[in-house]
UniProtKB/Swiss-Prot annotation:
Pfam families: FinO_N, ProQ. SUPFAM superfamilies: FinO-like (SSF48657). This is Fertility inhibition protein. One of the components on the FinOP fertility inhibition complex, which inhibits the expression of traJ gene, which in turn regulates the expression of some 20 transfer genes. The transfer genes are responsible for the process, called conjugal transfer, in which DNA is transmitted from one bacterial host to another. RNA-binding that interacts with the traJ mRNA and its antisense RNA, finP, stabilizing finP against endonucleolytic degradation and facilitating sense-antisense RNA recognition. Belongs to the FinO family. Disulfide bonds: none annotated.
Length: 186
């Protein structure tokens, strides 16, 4: 007879196409851990998350502290407008003449205006670094003095410089917003 054609039954048969599964020394968790242990693990995870968030907030606070805290454009306009209305077209600041800070400081001393040098400097920085002011700096635009008279015109180099400053300020504002979002998250 042809015994070679009959399948031979063996105990150590290999399965075709499947990877062998390890059945010895596998750990089977039959019971769940006690509630106090689960609670302790959750508290430890929560403490780790809070510590990480605190560290992230401290880092964001430190990174945010390098930027100047200038007043808003409206506050700066309201600071200077009562004393020098010629610098503004309604509530919009006009382009300021070069060297206007020294002129304003002399005017403060001469007229005894209750405005400190620091407040004046910060207000001028807030105005000249605002997006609306830098966008208005186009070649051929006029610069104004304290009385509202035209003193000079914007050159091509000043327009290029204003565009670069505008890009830099927008980048800084985007970074500030991201850092502030980190500080505000809970």
């Amino acid at each position: 007879m042809t015994e070679q054609k009959r399948p031979v039954l063996t105990l150590k048969r290999k399965t075709e196409g499947e990877t062998p599964t390890r059945s010895r020394k596998t750990i089977i968790n039959v019971t769940t851990p006690p509630k106090w242990k689960v609670k302790k693990q959750k508290l430890a995870e929560k403490a780790a998350r809070e510590a990480e968030l605190t560290a992230k907030k401290a880092q964001a606070r430190q990174a945010l502290s390098i930027y100047l805290n200038l007043p808003t454009l409206d506050e700066a306009v309201n600071t200077l407008k009562p004393w020098w209305p010629g610098l503004f077209d309604g509530d919009t600041p006009r382009l300021l003449a070069c060297g206007i800070r020294d002129v304003l400081l002399e005017d403060v001393a001469q007229r005894n205006i209750p405005l400190s040098h620091k407040k004046l400097r910060r207000a001028l920085k807030a105005i000249t670094r605002s997006e609306s002011y830098l966008c208005a700096m186009k070649a051929g635009a006029c610069r104004y003095d304290t009385e509202g008279y035209v003193t000079e015109h914007i050159s091509q180099e000043e327009e290029v410089y204003a565009a670069e400053r505008l890009d830099k300020i927008r980048r800084q504002n985007r970074i500030k917003a991201e850092l502030q979002a980190v500080l505000d998250e809970q």
